[in-house]
Swiss-Prot record:
<dbReference type="GO" id="GO:0003735">
    <property type="term" value="F:structural constituent of ribosome"/>
</dbReference>
<dbReference type="GO" id="GO:0022625">
    <property type="term" value="C:cytosolic large ribosomal subunit"/>
</dbReference>
<keyword id="KW-0687">Ribonucleoprotein</keyword>
<dbReference type="InterPro" id="IPR018261">
    <property type="entry name" value="Ribosomal_bL27_CS"/>
</dbReference>
<dbReference type="GO" id="GO:0006412">
    <property type="term" value="P:translation"/>
</dbReference>
<dbReference type="InterPro" id="IPR001684">
    <property type="entry name" value="Ribosomal_bL27"/>
</dbReference>
<dbReference type="Pfam" id="PF01016">
    <property type="entry name" value="Ribosomal_L27"/>
</dbReference>
<protein>
    <recommendedName>
        <fullName>Large ribosomal subunit protein bL27</fullName>
    </recommendedName>
</protein>
<keyword id="KW-0689">Ribosomal protein</keyword>
<comment type="similarity">
    <text>Belongs to the bacterial ribosomal protein bL27 family.</text>
</comment>
Length: 91
């Protein structure tokens, strides 16, 4: 009768669930209030005009318009702003 000694158990074999972070709406896209623009950990992108920030650093639209991404300041901060619909239609 063939016998094999029992193998030891392992403490590996798990992985965390993906958090679905990233940019959800891109520059030039039309947006309405409440839409999520960026899901992030920390402030990779900063809130500009017409954009709010949630407690988990999620950026969301506060006004209707078109999204604009910009790099500003001495530290090269990335800002997300919204050009309001009234300005877009007037241009």
């Amino acid at each position: 009768m063939a016998h094999k000694k029992a193998g030891g158990s392992t403490r590996n074999g798990r992985d965390s669930e993906a958090k679905r972070l990233g940019v959800k709406m891109y520059g030039g896209q039309a947006i309405i209030p409440g839409n999520i623009i960026v899901r992030q950990r920390g402030t990779q992108f900063h809130a500009g005009y017409g954009v709010g920030m949630g407690k988990d650093h999620t950026l969301f639209a506060k006004v209707e318009g078109v999204i604009k991404f910009q790099v500003k300041g001495a530290f090269g901060r990335r800002y997300v702003s919204i050009v309001p619909k009234t300005e877009v239609s007037a241009a």
